[in-house]
Structures are given as structure tokens and as C-alpha cells.
């Protein structure tokens, strides 16, 4: 039953323009129902965002795929994720690259995500409880940075931690939000607006 729902979801994603086969294989390999509350597991393969507690959500599969595709990952890409959340996006990234660094400001979510990833034998992820606005400078620079919550403006620390040729994908804005794709070229940043989106806000600071 789960496999049938997964295949339906993958077909929907293809129809929405997701064509990267390596990405689609990663999506197929990650059991989304393991990242949501058991009471919502029947909705795990619907193409919609779902609550995960602490005022946070697990992103819509299309948005996970779209943002990941924009990163243009190769197996050796150095990746930073801001907002571990449930760990679902983290797991997708872990199937695509050799190592993922992920920062989560809410300690409980970080712990749960770390446990889920371990249960799925995804050991190529380093998680950290910290302020996502600050990134993870000691592990940078990064070829790709993905932010799963929306700051009102692009955090300077994340731009500084982006390597030459690197790509930063994030939602930006408060009431009206847009998905931005930022590429660093010759120490200049080219910002492209991709589409209108709706994410939870990227809050500064840490929460125990």
C-alpha cells in the first residue's frame, strides 16, 4: 500500500516538473511516514506539508524536491541545511551527497531527527543544536546551502559560508514569501526569484 502511494506521489512530482532521476530515487528511498506523527502517517504520501510539533512542519514533497533540484548537487557537494526539523529533507540530502551538515534551533526536534536518521542507517549526517541564522562556519565553506524556514532577508552569515560557485536556496519574506536561488560568482551574488512560497519563519537564537 505504501509503495503504491509512493509511486503515485513520484508520478505527481514528475508531472510538476521534477525530472532529476537521482533525486527521484532518493525520494523513493526515504520512508516519509517515519518522519511524521503516527496519527498522520496515512497522509505521509500526500503532496502537502504536515505539522511536526513545536510550530514547525515537514515540507510538501514537491517543495523538498524543487529546492533540492535547484542546489545542483553532485555526490561530493559539501551541503549545509538550516532547519533540520523532522529530518526528512536531511535524509533526502544524505542519499545524494557524501556528507550533510544540519543545524536546528529546537533541541527536541534535533534529537528526534538524529534518532530517525540513525534508525534509517544514515550515518553521513552531522547535526547541531544552534542558531540557523549563524550557519556552521567551522564546517564551511559549502557548495550548497538549503534553508527550510523563511528569514525576512538573506542572512549575511550564510552568504559568507557559501563557496565560490556555490548555491544557496531559501524562502525569503514575512507575509509575502518567495523562493530565492543565490549563486556566488567571483565574490558577487546573483539572486534569482523562483516562485511564491509559504514557510514557517526562520527564528533567531536557540530553543532548548
Curated annotation (Swiss-Prot):
Its EC number is 2.1.1.77. It catalyses: [protein]-L-isoaspartate + S-adenosyl-L-methionine = [protein]-L-isoaspartate alpha-methyl ester + S-adenosyl-L-homocysteine. Its main location: cytoplasm. It is found in: Cytoplasm. The active site is at residue 59. The keyword Iron does not apply. PANTHER family: PROTEIN-L-ISOASPARTATE O-METHYLTRANSFERASE (PTHR11579), PROTEIN-L-ISOASPARTATE(D-ASPARTATE) O-METHYLTRANSFERASE (PTHR11579:SF0). NCBIfam families: pimt, PRK00312.1. Belongs to the methyltransferase superfamily. L-isoaspartyl/D-aspartyl protein methyltransferase family. This is Protein-L-isoaspartate O-methyltransferase. It comes from Yersinia enterocolitica serotype O:8 / biotype 1B (strain NCTC 13174 / 8081).
Amino acid at each position: 500500500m505504501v509503495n503504491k502511494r509512493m509511486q503515485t506521489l513520484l508520478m505527481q512530482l514528475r508531472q510538476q516538473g521534477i525530472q532529476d532521476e537521482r533525486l527521484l530515487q532518493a525520494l523513493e528511498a526515504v520512508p516519509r511516514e517515519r518522519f511524521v506523527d503516527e496519527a498522520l502517517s496515512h497522509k505521509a504520501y500526500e503532496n502537502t506539508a504536515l505539522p511536526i510539533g513545536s510550530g514547525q512542519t515537514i515540507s510538501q514533497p514537491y517543495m523538498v524536491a524543487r529546492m533540492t533540484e535547484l542546489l545542483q548537487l553532485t555526490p561530493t557537494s559539501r551541503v549545509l541545511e538550516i532547519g533540520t526539523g523532522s529530518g526528512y529533507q536531511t535524509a533526502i540530502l544524505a542519499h545524494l551527497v557524501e556528507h550533510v551538515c544540519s543545524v536546528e534551533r529546537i533541541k527536541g526536534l534535533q534529537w528526534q531527527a538524529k534518532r530517525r536518521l540513525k534508525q534509517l542507517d544514515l550515518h553521513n549526517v552531522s547535526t547541531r543544536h544552534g542558531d540557523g541564522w549563524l550557519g556552521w562556519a567551522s564546517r564551511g565553506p559549502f557548495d550548497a546551502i538549503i534553508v527550510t524556514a523563511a528569514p525576512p532577508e538573506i542572512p549575511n552569515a550564510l552568504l559568507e559560508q557559501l563557496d565560490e560557485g556555490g548555491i544557496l536556496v531559501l524562502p525569503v519574506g514575512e507575509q509575502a514569501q518567495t523562493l530565492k536561488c543565490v549563486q556566488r560568482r567571483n565574490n558577487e551574488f546573483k539572486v534569482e526569484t523562483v516562485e511564491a512560497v509559504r514557510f514557517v519563519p526562520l527564528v533567531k537564537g536557540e530553543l532548548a
